[in-house]
């Protein structure tokens, strides 16, 4: 009773605050049961709303169903509502079930019932589950409906903005970069320590970025230090528990959905044109006391080329029909230096980057079952296109998942699941994380992108390397298999036996070809003779076995006990090697034998 009185007092304070500000609390999706009699006097319904302990409910919403006519109860739980005879009256309040009664003859005395549904919701917390009402730690729960409709590339991004205190950030723009996850802000400054939470997928440690977001049934985020009582030193920064979907009793259900997306750069830049750039550089040199960098003759050529109409690579035509070129040759054989003689007008950000990148995703799943057997299977394909213009950059992902559950006997249940993920990543071999900022320093607008023959001009322009130097690829396969046994020989005594095997194979291939300039006649000239092929291999095998038993019982219908004990063992084996061969002999066979 003391607990009930405390709850009533807190609700009364909430209702007083609502009445003081003149704001009516919104009706809630709750039901109530009571005895009701209605007095109809001149179209006015009067009555009182009480809680299960008989205390008045302050601020309960009372309204005529299907209309905007409504009121709230006063400090004594009383109300007066304009309603016609026979009108249906709804009474609702947060934390209680809603009642709908028909206006009759007599006072309306309503006794609400507690809505225990929210408190009975089961949450995955560590080994096993708990009801929300019994939780003492900080836990946030997300269900599949909140995740499925989000157009994201991975499950980590799907959680962004859904969990208070969960911070998700990216430290790199590379397409194979994975987001960083942090639960409680910056928690460590130690070198090599990221302070990331422990991530468990169906009870086994895994990578959140490798699963299909639409395979997720629910996510529980354990935020406080209480998680360390179960997971020890691996969980000081929180735990993210992911439960994937499984089959349900009922007829077979087939789902398919897709999405097509166009992405733009968040802060795409554009360079000033060649005329403005040359003027600014001259002003800077003059202010520094070193005179102008672009003399008058070159300035005139820059202005003329800027005002002319493009008609071909490195070529424009002025109003008089004269052809102008972004770079010339002084000796008739090789092109002049771009910094010293170039008069082109190139926006390097526009030349190297697309304005939009295309992505597409396809999802298909099938599920069904009965009381004895259920199944779930899914397939996902995700293509993420990059922003590079001169060569392909992409990151593709393939996901397949299957899960079956079988009630073998009355006391034995078996679950088996398998999940396979492949990611294919590709980018130009000379693409670096600093390219975008390097363009601001090295990408002068007067530097030519191409000569008049259509060949890419040499460095310091990055175009030649991006278009012709080779590619960097990475292929990653992850296979995850789990077997779960649930043994319940007597009621409320359950024993869980789980085994997980995960294998990962990653192969990276990086080749660097020789770079060729071209002379005025279009003949190739070796610019960079450095060439090599690099191969990396990474293999990982992970084994996890855990067994725990739990027993629930109650005394005097008031004292609930949950006893649990268990054991866990895991093993991780890694193999990693890399090699590189310099001096490519045959560019048609870029491989290491």
Task: Annotate each language-model stretch with its function.
Residues 147, 151, 175, 354, ...:
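Catalytic cores of large soluble enzymes that bind and process phosphate-bearing ligands
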Residues 244-246, 368-370, 406-407, 485-487, ...:
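Residue-level signature of outer-membrane beta-barrel architecture
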